[in-house]
Curated annotation (Swiss-Prot):
Recorded name of the encoding gene: ftsH
Membrane spanning residue stretches: 5-25, 104-124
UniProt: Zn(2+) binding residues: H417, H421, D495
Protein name, UniProt field: ATP-dependent zinc metalloprotease FtsH
Annotated catalytic residues: E418
């Protein structure tokens, strides 16, 4: 039973005890039901002279008969009672009314609010600090991983082999330190896992816990600092003391950026408390006292905000980058997650891996789970390839909103908008191949053209950037050509935003503007935590020049898209008409449609396709017999 359940039982027992105590006191002040007689019967006995003596206590009368039996009764307001008793020779004893009950009630009424507040405060303090030690604010919240339950090992980790090898060495050191110490090697004091969200940093830590036969403590960076001053530093000290007592051991700090940010940034007591906590952590990790056998493993997706003193060797000796997996890594990750579900032997993980560039391990796990839910919803006995393809489209493009009712005019406008994207993407050879075009609303978009690269891309060439900007502007251009400038809509807002950001990065980050030159100007968002590279460092003339160059690049892409769509207006009409009729077209179907001006009967009977291979390069001259592909224009250097 957990601590919360035990606390509830304790308070329930206390409540029942108070109720019983109240009843005991109450019963003492009430008339006993033993030998109780009515007041009329009592008067009759008095008149018959069978009553020997009575004791009057308020309204309660207790008496003794001549035969020695006792009785009791409750008297109403009867002024002549004493005279009647005297006339019948009854011995009378009068005592004051019982005041014990009133005193107890008065005590409860006066002290109950204060006792209630104290009880609530103690209860919450016990909840905050582990069910005991009500004054143990400074105790560490690090949890020792239990041996119970299924263990995660390195076999469950795939796609990040380099990071796994680095951490395997640490596990081997903890298991057999003599192997390394005989050459004079020392165990690394700390290891920092760096990478975007979902790449498997926490999973690696769990795998280390499953592999290493040493105590494993886990804590979050946000668990150190709370509302009381000095609590964070105290918890850091207690955590390392706990580690020393269990050495050799591993302490895992997740999201260390919550406590390890740059010092001296910001103002206020909360910030001072965080800095005090960080200072204590720096001392404990590499101070005068040795922490032999205590290995710190931390994870963060914001290494840029961490304090430099925390990152130096001697504290975090190793910084391991856990990046998104490549195509081979994605295939291995899919195989790991597919083992946990019932799937068809016809599934080819390599095809799904090829169509999910940039996916993290968490996103691939979610994709497999979505495919499983889709198969279960359709009462299938196993997950099939089509379910994975549909789940991929759902994750990448959003959920289909088929219930959304679109007017014919809106549907036509969306078809030409998406057709413009697809056609320009088809003719810009530097652009990624088209995976799918649809006018079915998905997420917040009324339609979408999905393009996927043939292979993993680790850098982006300039001609692809220019092609992507042209493809982004093609939707707005298609609306202007078909419906006129006065009829254009706000549907291109996200496209314009994407094109502007790309152009700005070309000028300020990548030095691709001849006028601005290969100078890094950075973005204003970088000064959030570091106060470096702020846009305010630029001169006014430089900012104006950057704006001019950004506008020039976007306008060049706009002109390229307009040139392509104007020359191939007939193909735009064909593509838009097919989108209106079938709603969804794969890249291969668009290729066949524009090369032969018709669809094969087999394709026509299977609309809409769930997905098509994203590895088909569709902008080829032999496939487009009536149109010559146009390459993206280079930026005017004048």
């Amino acid at each position: 039973m957990n601590n919360q359940g035990k606390n509830i039982i304790v308070w329930a027992v206390i409540f029942v005890f108070v109720i019983l105590l109240f009843n005991v006191f109450q019963s003492d002040g009430l008339l006993s039901s033993k030998n109780n007689i009515s007041f009329s019967e009592f008067l009759t006995k008095v008149d018959e002279k069978t009553v020997n003596s009575v004791k009057i206590q308020g309204r309660i009368i207790e008496g003794t008969s001549n035969d020695g039996s006792s009785f009791s009764t409750y008297a109403p307001d009867y002024p002549d009672l004493v005279n009647r008793l005297n006339n019948n020779d009854v011995n009378i004893e009068v005592v004051p009314p019982e005041t014990r009950m009133n005193t107890f009630l008065s005590f409860l009424i006066s002290w109950f609010p204060m006792l209630l507040l104290i009880g609530v405060w103690v209860f919450f303090m016990r909840q905050m600090h582990g069910g005991g030690k009500a004054m143990g604010f400074g105790k560490s919240k690090a949890k020792l991983l239990s041996d119970k339950g299924p263990k995660i090992t390195f076999k469950d980790v795939a796609g990040i082999d380099e990071a796994k090898d680095e951490l395997t060495e640490i596990v081997d050191f903890l298991r057999d330190p003599s192997k390394f110490q005989k050459l004079g090697g020392k165990i690394p004091k700390g290891c920092l896992l760096i990478g975007p969200p979902g790449t498997g940093k926490t999973l690696l830590a769990k795998a280390i816990a499953g592999e290493a036969n040493v105590p494993f403590f886990s804590i979050s960076g946000s668990d150190f600092v709370e509302m009381f001053v000095g609590v964070g530093a105290s918890r850091v000290r207690d955590m390392f003391e706990q580690g020393k007592r269990n050495a050799p051991c591993i302490i895992f700090i997740d999201e260390i950026d919550a406590v390890g940010r740059h010092r001296g940034i910001g103002m206020g007591g909360g910030n001072d408390e965080r800095e005090q906590t960080l200072n204590q952590m720096l001392v404990e990790m590499d101070g005068f006292e040795a922490n032999e056998g205590v290995v710190i493993i931390a994870a963060t997706n914001r290494p840029d905000v961490l304090d430099n003193a925390l990152l130096r060797p001697g504290r975090f000796d190793r910084q391991i980058t856990v990046s998104n997996p490549d195509i081979d890594g994605r295939e291995k990750i899919l195989q790991v997650h597919l083992k946990k579900v019932k799937y068809s032997t016809k599934i080819v993980p390599r095809i799904i891996a090829r169509g999910t560039p940039g996916f993290s391990g968490a996103e691939l796990a979610n994709l497999v789970n979505e495919a499983t839910l889709i198969a279960a919803r359709r009462n299938k006995k196993e997950v099939e390839m089509h379910d994975l393809e549909e789940a991929k489209d759902k994750v990448m493009m959003g959920v289909e909103r088929r219930s959304m009712i679109m007017s014919d005019e809106q549907k036509k406008l969306t078809a030409y908008h998406e057709g413009g994207h697809a056609l320009v993407g088809l003719y810009c050879l530097a652009s990624d191949p088209i995976h799918k075009a649809t006018i079915i609303p998905r997420g917040r978009a009324l339609g979408m053209v999905m393009r996927l690269p043939e292979n993993d891309r680790f850098s982006m060439p300039r001609d692809k950037m220019e092609a992507d900007i042209a493809v982004a502007m093609a939707g707005r251009v298609a609306e202007e050509i078909i419906f006129g400038k006065e009829k254009v809509t706000s549907g291109a807002s996200s496209d314009i935003k994407m094109a502007t950001r790309m152009a700005k990065a070309m000028v300020t980050d990548w030095g691709l503007s001849d006028k601005v030159g290969p100078v890094y100007h950075g973005s204003a968002s970088e000064d959030m935590y570091t106060n470096r590279n702020s846009s305010s460092d630029r001169s006014e003339s430089t900012s104006e020049l950057i704006d001019e160059e950004v506008k020039k690049i976007v306008t060049t892409g706009y002109d390229l898209a307009k040139d392509i769509l104007t020359k191939h207006l007939d193909q735009l009409h064909i593509l838009a008409k097919a989108l209106i009729e079938y709603e969804t077209l794969s890249g291969q179907q668009i290729k066949n449609l524009l090369s032969s001006r018709q669809l094969d009967s087999e394709e026509e009977n299977n609309f809409p396709f769930g997905a098509a291979s994203s590895t088909i390069k569709i902008a080829e001259e032999k496939d487009l017999k009536k149109a010559k592909p146009i390459k993206a224009k280079k930026e005017d250097k004048s």
